[in-house]
Amino acid sequence: MTLSLRSSGAKLMVTVFAFGACAYVTYRIGAQAYVGWCIKQSTKTSLDRALALDPGNCGAEYRLGLHYSFVLTDLDLKRGQELLRTAVRCQPLDSQYWLALAATLEASGDLPEAKAAAQKVSALESHNSVLLWRSGNLLLRMGQLPEAFDLFHRVIEGAPEYLPLVFSTCWKSTGDGDLILHRAVPDTVDSDLAYLDFLSLAQNLDLNALQTAWGRSTGSEQEEPTGKNFDQVSALIRSKGTPEEIHAWDKSVKAALQPRLDEAEKVWDRLLALGEEFDPKKSFNFFQSLLEADRPQEAVKAWDKLVARGILPRREQHLSNDLIVNGGFEAEPINGGLDWRIYPVGGVLVTNDRENRVEGGRSLSVHFEGLRNLDFKHVSQFVPVKPNTVYYFSAFLKSRALSTLSGPHFEIYDYWDDRRDERTGERKVSWKTAEVLGDTEWTKYQLTIHTGPKTDLLVVSLRRQPALELDKRIQGTMWVDDVRLSTIPDTE
């Protein structure tokens, strides 16, 4: 059917209708744009205008609810909750709306409803680590630790960069290490290693508690040292404190670290139970903390578990109870734990040598380039021992063109006995082999060591003390092989 508009009246009506429709559409578009602009402004006045123009606008109700809930000058929790409840009914799948409602309910003391709203976030979100983190913290403030830790577990799975923050937050909220380990920390190699590292480092201890313990132990009335972090406070005490204050600080740190290391050992066992390969170097802070917390035998047990798993090579045991790890340098030293620690220093080149050796496949070569009068102590190993015990040390050394007034030698000392000679600054209690000088063939050097009543950790160090004349540099090469420490005399 064809509609004919021949009369001027009909044409006018159509024109008016079309114009009105266009004007209405233009108005609605403009109004919506204005509403959007008002919402973005997020002031109370602009949000009121937005709702006046568009009643029931979810975004406006949400932002106005936030305003009444958290802007102190306009605080009205009841009104804020009403608006946020309307917003979640309007947008029931928006996690941010539920999180805001949970926060305002928690602020007003309605904990059951706040918990239910926070749990809505966890039900809706699977990958948004930011919202899961906020929801978990909200549950934490309400004392819902298991539920909060479950959310932190999911946060770590989706965003590993949250690991240190999660660990720190959990330990500030509770001392229940089992709850943290089993609810917050994913049972994976990376998570367990990161948590092990966190527990092992003194830098992650409660700084305020440490400062308080230090103040009590010193009995000092002076103000506690202030700093932004552990390292700053520790450095301040060491630079300005008396020997007694420094000792008290070390004692406070050691005491605070003990319960953390109890938990770290549980993490270690769980990590090994996974049966997966990992880089042992990532666990070295754990071993170092065990040693420095005066738990050397536990370090041995943890090390032996790595060996049993095949992650580390088995000890070269020429004697049935040889305590030196990798004494023949057959495996590459890994610079940590109970293995050799070889640190770089200018003017010295430390390498493995397959040509010069006593037995096995190689030895350790140390070449001094003659650049300076060097204080060399850059090859060492921590060795857990027993108090009041006789040990027999031996090592083979060789040298070529080693010119110096002060030659290299092995020095063994009690890690905890730091008493020093006032004149030389050297340790009062240590055992030293004869110095190596000039050209020598492989020669066996031996020591008999009687540990004291408190000695449980020795340091075996390749040492060269500076010559008294400053211009007497050291030049030449020495080799080391077949280093041993045992309670049985070496008769070979």
Regions found by a protein language model. Give the residues of each.
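Residue at a conserved register position within TPR or TPR-like alpha-solenoid repeats
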Residues: 68, 105, 139, 169-170, ...
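Extracellular and organelle-lumenal recognition/adhesion modules and their flexible linkers in secreted
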Residues: 9-23, 27-28, 32-36, 161, ...
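Canonical positions in the second alpha-helix
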Residues: 49-50, 86-87, 120-121, 155, ...
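Structural signature of tandem alpha-helical TPR/SEL1-like repeats
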Residues: 36-48, 72-86, 107-120, 142-150, ...
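TPR alpha-solenoid repeat register
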Residues: 60, 97, 131, 162-166, ...
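N-terminal leader/linker segments that initiate helical-solenoid repeat arrays
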Residues: 7-81
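Structural marker of alpha-solenoid helical repeat scaffolds
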Residues: 53, 90, 124-125, 158-159, ...
